Amino acid sequence: MKTLIYAIRFLARSKSYTIINLLGLAFSLACCIILMRYIHRELTVDTHCLDREQVYATVIDLEGNRGLSSFNDYQYDTVRIDQRHIEHYTEYTPLEKDFVIKEGERFFTRTIVTDSTFFHLFQYPLLQGRIALDKAESVLLKKDFATKMFGKENPIGKTIRHSNGKDLVIEGILGEPTCKTSLQFDMVISTTLSTRWDRSATSIYRFMPGTDIEELNRYGSIPRYANDPQWDSRQYTFSFVPMKDVYWDDSTNSAEDTMFFYGSKSQISILTGVCLLMLLTGLLNFVNLYLMTMLRRGKEYGLKKIYGANGKNLFIQIWLENTLLIVWALLFAWLFIEVTQIPINRLLNTNFVYTPFDGWLSLGILLLLPLVTSCYPFLKYNYGSPIRSIQSIGWSNRSVRSRMCFLGIQYILTFLLVVSALYFNRQLDLLLHTEPGFRTKNILVANLVYESRDFNNFSEQRYLQERARTQALNEKILACPFIEYHQSCYESIIEKTYGTNYINAKGESAYLNIMYVSPQFFRMFDIDIEEGSIPEKPERSTYVLNRAAMKALNFSSLGEAAVVEDNRKRRDANAPMSTISAVVKDYYNGHLTAGAVPTIYEVSGFGGPRYQIAYPEGRKQDLLNYLKETMKGIYGAEEFTYTFLEDDVKALYKEDQKIASIYNIFALIAIAVSCLGLFGISLFDIRQRYREIAIRKAHGAGMKNLYQLLFKKYLAVLGASFVVAVPIAYYLIHQYTADFVVKAPIGMGIFVLALLLVAIISMGTLYWQIRKAANIDPATVMKTE
């Protein structure tokens, strides 16, 4: 108890240094806790899945087109999985662009079609009603979607009409799990409603304990025909991927990009690095300032050792003082986190909720951090000579060197953060302002066809009705005075599409992305034709390659460019080659860092439910009003979903913007923490030199000489830290961007700017104290010192 009281008394007496130390550690801990909570949330995605390491999703690889699916869709080669190995089986079909109608109003929804077994494997909180999918008309809604449709009204038992024309009865309302989920949906309908949709189902298995998954995956790696090889020689393989890995497997293609979230391990590595840098900066600052306050007690420790004090008592005293500081710092850190919760949620694009992890994290900090921060002070004073401790009260060359060394390491870490922040901002600026190679301005991407996706309801009458509505829509589009060009398709110009291998006349093959386009496509997006020409109204399919595809197939000119699909060649060895009519300029149809994708364009009248529409400047609202009237006249509801291509392209760099913002914020906090440490150290060091300054002034030293004397040491530390940090930062940035096709140069400008930024802020921190010291009255100091 006496030791605790003594520790509190000592910290209270050194209140200036205690407050500085407390603030520096609190800011560092707050940053680290925020990042660790985010990293933990990313690493625990889909933990609402019971035993996610034993629940597996099926991944199908159809000749390079990899995605979540089911081998049940391919009936030619039978796949046999021993039923004794399967504990639970379910499947779900994602319908991203689905809709329901309530009282004549259309509501767009992300739907999954599944059975009750799905909810045995994946736990969702039930807020109202019951989880029941035993009837064909049963439907479950997520809370947010139910509120959007019904407001505060109780939706249980209410009827809504699905896009397939059938009425559904709301059985239950679901909440969101506390963890992040890779699958997002608004509505759940029963597999008994229909078994055939326009999207493939994804099979989910829970295998019995002891099942050899590696053996099953070896069985799945054997190529099998997707269909009868007489007319389709494509082959597929399958594998079982545990749910804990699905979120990280972004190689799986998904046409439902708003229903599936994927994580980035490289992003987690970056955030882990930032977290460690912030933690080290805070800890070094904390230990350095604490050691500085302990210098005043050198005589006390020396005398205690002479009179037989043991190391245990010394360690307990140091540990208690550190624990008290860390407890208060942790409280301030959580206060900071609570106050900044809304902007942090926006920055990290997540919704943090308090979980047991927060408690364990705080407990871990309280248990481990005092031990870590107590080790060096204990070793220094416990194993040092008592005579040296007595002689070095307040000042010694050795203590000055150790303080400057700690400060230097802090500045190395700060420079790494600042340089990284500057580089990532430059990279982001490059990404946002580099033209992708196609027109993005005044392009509307809209879903205008709203028909049933239920193939069980297919009939000739329904087909004719849908065809008539689509024809009426196209006629209205052609008649619109606010449309320059339009293209109907399934994917927009920047979305993933299907691909396959193509072979040239020499037998060389390359994987090409396939896009089905109209002749207007190239004019609408201002894509230059470099060789050949594209017919205005092709009588049959015409093929066009981009420059990247020409390079991939080793074509030097259009004259030698002819290809055949590998699938077709395997089916018929004498299959004719398709000549290439034109070569177009490369453009970036995804993230710039991935480069241009080798693409073959099949130019025909093929179309889909999505329309890409180019409109004149200033006609956006006129176009939207026209389309709403058109939708009202054809489908009876004016609502439709749309985006603008310019916004879609910017959204490609959403994660880059997040990383750049994180670096900016945490680099500034690192500078602030380092400056707090610098302020505390300089407050102590300069005060110790008042007598020296007074003597120098008495002997005629001018203000310039004193400024040089007092600034010199800190400038030397800053310069040395910069020299060490530059090659480390260069290496880390170079390694991270090694695979980027488009990247900002690592010029000296960012290093010089980082030096100026840190130096100006740091020297500004010092200026007040140095100016005060340089203006002291020598006579007053000589009397009091």
Model-based region annotation:
Residues F261-Q341, N345-R346, W360:
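Hydrophobic alpha-helical bundles that form the membrane domains of multi-pass transporters
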Residues C32-E153, H162-D167, R218, N425-I529, ...:
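Structured, solvent-exposed hinge/loop segments at the ends of secondary-structure elements
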Residues L4-I20, G24, L284-L325, Y383-I393, ...:
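Intracellular coupling helices
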Residues L4, R9, R13-S14, C49, ...:
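Membrane-helix entry/capping segments
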Residues R13-H40, Y262-K299, S402-Q427, Q657-R691, ...:
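Hydrophobic alpha-helical transmembrane segments of multi-pass inner-membrane transport and secretion
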Residues D115-L127, V139-G263, E475-A651:
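Mid-to-C-terminal secondary-structure elements
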Residues A30, I34-R37, S239, N288, ...:
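Small-residue-rich transmembrane alpha-helices
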Residues L11, N21, E42, T58, ...:
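Generic structural signal for small/hydrophobic residues in well-ordered secondary structure
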